[in-house]
Amino acid sequence: MRRVNVEELRKGDLILVRWMDASEIRCSMDEHEGSPEIYCKDWGVYLGVSGRKRRLLLVGKDVVEVHNDWGAARIPLELVDEILLVMPRKETLKAIREIQALGRRVRLRKWRKGEIERVRVV
């Protein structure tokens, strides 16, 4: 992984974004003053930058294949601390195709109602 700027990214790159999120917490004033920042990490597919009033980094999380609808995080660029390129677009597409091929080769066993044992989670 290497640190990159938004300008270096191409749509389809797999990225990890470290950014500061707004939060609400109840604690003493000392704790508020000691560490007020809350950092988050989001990773996914870079979909671009958008926004009218503020520029937002779009990070794709999942896609509904039938409609080609993307679920995405919309992160204000001014809150981004760093962006790491996990895998360039070309390698990401290759990895996804390999995973899809593996999924087609895996056979799932169907269980009948009487065959399933009850499991108690403690």
Each predicted region: which residue ranges?
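Conserved RNA-binding domains used in RNP assembly and mRNA/RNA metabolism
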Residues: 2-122
